[in-house]
Amino acid sequence: MLKKLFSFSDRYRILHQTWFAFFLTFVCWFNFAPFATTIGKELHLAPEQIKTLGICNLALTIPARLIIGMLLDRFGPRITYSILLMFAVVPCLATALAQDFNQLVISRLLMGIVGSGFVVGIRMVAEWFQPKEMGIAQGIYGGWGNFGAFGAEFALPILAISTSFFSGGASNWRLAIALVGIITAIYGVIYYNTVQDTPRGKVYKKPKKNGSLEVTSIKSFWAMMISNFGLIFALGLLAWRLEQKKIHFLTLSQMYLTWLVLAGLFAYQSYKAWQVNRELLTGKKTYPVSERFQFGQVALLEFTYITNFGSELAAVSMLPAFFEKTFGLEHVVAGMIAATYPFLNLVSRPSGGLISDKFGSRKWTMTIISVGIGVSYLMAHFINSNWPIPVAIAVTMFAAYFAQAGCGATYSIVPMIKKEATGQIAGNVGAYGNFGGVVYLTIFSLTDAPTLFSTMGIAALICAFMCAFFLKEPKGSFAPAYEGEASETATKSSVFLTEE
């Protein structure tokens, strides 16, 4: 595959167009962090408000990834991604025109929807590439797309400075953010007109039922319910944070009302899950062994994504301000240094997928990388102003490599679970990455950077233990074609994790 990577024909063209779509959504999603201190000074924001905006940036991505996953499985990645790209201009312009904290909160909440675009490409890539090369294909998609976070950290400050003549010599952050949204919307139109959901002659397989994931055992149903509650909890945590005295975006009664709405959302979500799985729960339907999958394995992948992508979200959001305050740097310089973290996505996430393809065990690849995440963040815990800046950068890049390689390893497994429900499963796993980001950034907003780093390190080591003892090796994960598919033509269901 690597030899033909830059041929830009057939499936490789689709891969490149799709990772670039993801790249643009990430540039949009992270366009606030490089300007956090500048915006804070201009709009007179307190440090706690800036931290809260970082949490808001992640919040709606949690339900959005679930919804996008269902829409994706029903309508296909071409339509879903195109609409999402065109929508990106709305929160970008809202941020660029914001005049106070409340307007920024609304714009960053909407921007979280754009951050759900990652899920779409997972299904697109899974349709065009074989299981034996799924790791590297998903790694390139995820890694090169995630490079958009670097594009935001590094390029946007330069763009803002280069257009400063429009704002009387001051850094023109508003124009930089607006331009990114406009470019992304234009690319959405291009994407719609130039890609296809599947190779010619291949059937795009859709779930038989919509509204919730169809599981194959009662045990998996209850595991899914617990998983769904965790995501609602993350949104409730955000509402609590927005009610705190130093933030006070919500009143106490508004917070309780938000919790009530979230409880209603969970009840509705549970009803839809029961409706989709009613025949299973009432004993009217049983699934043959070949069609079963364990939702517990999905839950483990959700945990891995908390520790790798969740920590990456937190790090990318707080590192510019961390370097600026710890070492007394100018915000542009601090942003460029912090950009070394997302910069590594270009190679680290693909390498995680490639190692998973070549190592011979996706389970042990995931376990070893999780250990690396834990150790590297525990090292970052000790960074302070007495450290040489190059050493601090090196430790940051060490943490970045393992966190991003872990993302590649996670999504080398996700498409192997149940092919026709890849969107929903990828949405669940991806949403838990945002869950991790919200929890980690909430911890950061209440404590400090060393506490955040140690928390992320300990969580990753616990995850490594869970993977070593409970994660199962996906069946058929090194096969030349999906189970039941003859080369490019889909005929039967593709299920790779069987329930015992």
From Swiss-Prot:
The record ties this protein, via PROSITE patterns, to: MFS (PS50850)
The record's InterPro entries line, in alphabetical order, gives:
MFS, MFS_dom, MFS_trans_sf, NO3_transporter, NO3_transporter_NarK/NarU-like
What Gene Ontology molecular function terms does this protein carry? nitrate transmembrane transporter activity; nitrite transmembrane transporter activity
Main localization, broad class: membrane
Membrane topology classification: Multi-pass membrane protein
Q: Which domain of life is it from?
A: Bacteria
Q: What is this protein called?
A: Nitrate/nitrite transporter NrtP
- What species is this protein from? Nostoc punctiforme (strain ATCC 29133 / PCC 73102)
Lineage of the organism = Bacteria, Bacillati, Cyanobacteriota, Cyanophyceae, Nostocales
